[in-house]
Amino acid sequence: MSLTEAEYHELEKQVNLDDIDFSDLEEQYEVDVGLDNYVVVDGAPIAPEAKVPVLIKVLKKLFNTVGKVVEGDEGIYMPLEDGKSKGYLFVQFETSEMAEAAIKQLHGKKLDQKHRLLVNRLSDIEKYGVEGNVAAEFVEPELPPFKSHGYLKSWLQDPQGRDQIALHHSETFGVFWNKKKSDPEPVFEPRKFFTSKYAKFSPKGTYLFSIHPQGVQSWGGADFSSIDKFMHNQVRLVDFSPNEKYMVTLSPLPITAPDSAAERAVFPFGPESYGHKLVIWDLTTGEPARTFALPPHLEGQKEMPWPLVKWSHDDKYCARQGPGALAVYETPSFQLLDKKLIKIDDIVDFEWAPAGVHLANNKSENGHHLLSYWTPESSNQTARVAVMQIPTRQILRTVNLFQVSDCKMHWQSEGKLLCVKVDRHTKSGKTIFTNLEFFKTTEKDIPVEKLELKEIVINFAWEPKSERFVIISRLDDGNLNSAIPKNIIDFYAPDVNGKGKSATSVYKSYKTITDKHSNTVFWSPKGRYVVVATISRSNGEIEFFDVSFDDSNKNAPANVKLLKNDKFSGMTNISWDPSGRFVATWSSSWLHTIENGYKLYEFTGNLLRDDSIDQFKEFIWRPRPASLLNSADRKKVRANLREYSAQFEESDAMEADAALRELIYARRRALEDWKAYRAKHASKAVKANEVQAEIIEEIKEEIIEEKEEIVE
């Protein structure tokens, strides 16, 4: 039965289509009209129409590396105008996930020297390109109000001159005032999950940094308020320039663009940083100053050499090592010095001088920037150690070495001396022994003194601002039984012969201690006192030495005396406080769970505290900046040292005994009350006894001589 046209229209009027559910049909025949699988690409080369097919073929091959481009003409559309391409194109992938991968991996990709591709979602272009979605006139962003963090070096104003320490145990982290034998005093309430890995002070103590999955957080001021955030996903390692201007972070994950446009708007990295893992941050602005990809030979390594970026003493230069070359950058531009690498075949390692060096033939007020490096032996050349001046790249001194197994470079704190520890092997290769090569950088032509040893040196440490040093060595006799103590401790100092310009010096061991397990050396930052320790899970030991014990003999270069020693099973770390007054040792749960906790000693070895703390991780002294006192100020302090010592001894006694502290405070209050009472009543007594004075002038005559004469 068929309906006439009139009957159909009548029936249509009777049926309400809004009451009919078409959802099943709509779902069955749904058509995808979304744009999520489309991307728009800017920055492509502008090519003549005849070469467009070739360009499309090249680009399609590139985009197929991250997904699958739709086949045919629909896959890539490149608009033309006036017989040439317009520099952008549209790419359609089979899925939105492929388009997302293209944005993350190819945004910022350099196609050649002149062209960098910018890949974005087509939906974002539509969103921001539609009229009305973006304001026609520029609206100046509102700057957030300035937030003061207080005086960032406020801890230096402590009346008692105390140092601050950071204690990290389990998931709790806190900063405290060191109170010697007493419990540390919290600077702020210790916090749980303050950091997800570890925390670190900047080299001069201005900032405290915590590590998180999202990046690094900086803290500072009297109450350690939040200062800045540095976004670097899954950051693992952190380092700083000596003057706290820059921070270096490393993550195992390459930098990629965030998913959303809103996140990309606040993302600190540009397309040129995508794929990089190493970031140098400007701590003043909080922005990245430069990013780097890891060298190919470091990709995939389980143990990463650190730091990857090394700094000159004044933050003026930084350098990083690559295969067969050294890259030196100038700050703050972080451009290559002279726009080229320093070619050094097979370079193994390098170190900057830790201070400006005053060369004998080229005086400079602030000293010169020097760095040292070494290269290994090859079939046609010997191993080589060289000292180079920056920025001239001039090689100032070279020493050729043979039968070399390894080298370690140790700069003296003032840059006046460089010791190169050269581990050499016999011709058979069965025995290792050490030579020490001393470069005297401030003397004419940088002479080199050699110290030949029969043993292999396992630890070397310079005394700060001195020419003395300590080494730990052992004889390489093939006996690998670690239970037998066979390490040797030697205390060296220069033995000077002659006077004036004709004087010569050679290094001489002034004390030797044999049959030890000791394996580490830690000098006081102020010199003279040194800790020699055995860091071991089972037989930890620490010994305190004074290398200038007999002050009566001023001409003796060294006079070594053992002050004290102590046992600490499971000891993993040792650290001096910045003032050289205290030494902290601790057992970290990061390495084992044996007797976790810390011990605090005076510089003479007297034990002050012994705290066993479950899951104790780390003890950190807060560093101090260099002293502002000049030589005259220091001389004045030394002259009044007895007076200052009495004040500090009284303060120490008060801290140690609460009852004594209250007694001293009570006596001080009573003395102040007496002084106030006396001043008040003495003035009253003067007023009560005041009498109106009258000045009377009285002339007295005295006969000195009487003489009688007769006048005729």
Curated annotation (Swiss-Prot):
RNA-binding component of the eukaryotic translation initiation factor 3 (eIF-3) complex, which is involved in protein synthesis of a specialized repertoire of mRNAs and, together with other initiation factors, stimulates binding of mRNA and methionyl-tRNAi to the 40S ribosome. The eIF-3 complex specifically targets and initiates translation of a subset of mRNAs involved in cell proliferation. It is found in: Cytoplasm. PANTHER family: EUKARYOTIC TRANSLATION INITIATION FACTOR 3 EIF3 -RELATED (PTHR14068), EUKARYOTIC TRANSLATION INITIATION FACTOR 3 SUBUNIT B (PTHR14068:SF0). CDD domains: RRM_eIF3B. Component of the eukaryotic translation initiation factor 3 (eIF-3) complex. Signal peptide: none annotated. It comes from Scheffersomyces stipitis (strain ATCC 58785 / CBS 6054 / NBRC 10063 / NRRL Y-11545) (Yeast). Keywords: Cytoplasm, Initiation factor, Protein biosynthesis, Repeat, RNA-binding, WD repeat. Residues 37-124 form the RRM domain. This is Eukaryotic translation initiation factor 3 subunit B.
